[in-house]
Amino acid sequence: MFDFGLGELVFVGIIALIVLGPERLPEAARTAGRLIGRLQRFVGSVKQEFDTQIELEELRKAKQEFEAAAAQVRDSLKETGTDMQNSLHDISDGLKPWEKLPEQRTPADFGVDENGNPFPDAANTLSDGISDVMPSERSDTSAEILGDSGQTGSTAEPAETDQDRAWREYLTASAAAPVVQTVEVSYIDTAVETPVPHTTSLRKQAISRKRGLRPKHRAKPKLRVRKS
């Protein structure tokens, strides 16, 4: 800390020995050592304080630089966002107007309401169209329907007779078949008696084994007698 050489220290020691004497010199040396130690600790704390202040200043500078960079990035993003919005507005302005779209139709244009039910006017027009059919056409269509039904009735008769014949053969075959007697067999569940394990004998065997494992000869404790 102090730029003292060996000669200066020896000189100071000689002066202290002359001034203080050999009796008070050790105590003065201890006091001087304590003072020097306190001074060194104080200087070390001050140095540490300066170092922390310097580090904090560097951190503040780094924080300011980081905030400045973040602000620049934010401004650039805002500029790009505004440019994109302007370009989108330009594109939307250049599009065709909505009036040129095809006209949208509603259910009323097709003669039905929102639930899909036809209006009364549409039902009346439909019934009028059906009533305008010629009576001759009605008679022709009814005759055709009757002719078709007669043909189907004439062709259905042999099918019914074949079915009756098949049923008759089935019934006669089932009547002539021999009767088979069934024998009922019943099974009776019988409980099987299981032998009871010899628990008492196993317990006795375990006790005898434990007794066999015990030491046969035990050392007798020796009593110590205190001598008075």
UniProtKB/Swiss-Prot annotation:
GO terms for molecular function: protein transmembrane transporter activity. It is a single-pass membrane protein. GO terms for cellular component: TAT protein transport complex. It is found in: Cell inner membrane. Residues 206-228 have a biased composition (Basic residues). InterPro entries: TatA/B/E, TatB. It comes from the Bacteria. Gene3D superfamilies: 1.20.5.3310. Keywords: Cell inner membrane, Cell membrane, Membrane, Protein transport, Translocation, Transmembrane, Transmembrane helix, Transport. It holds the Pfam family TatA_B_E. The Tat system comprises two distinct complexes: a TatABC complex, containing multiple copies of TatA, TatB and TatC subunits, and a separate TatA complex, containing only TatA subunits. Substrates initially bind to the TatABC complex, which probably triggers association of the separate TatA complex to form the active translocon. This is Sec-independent protein translocase protein TatB.
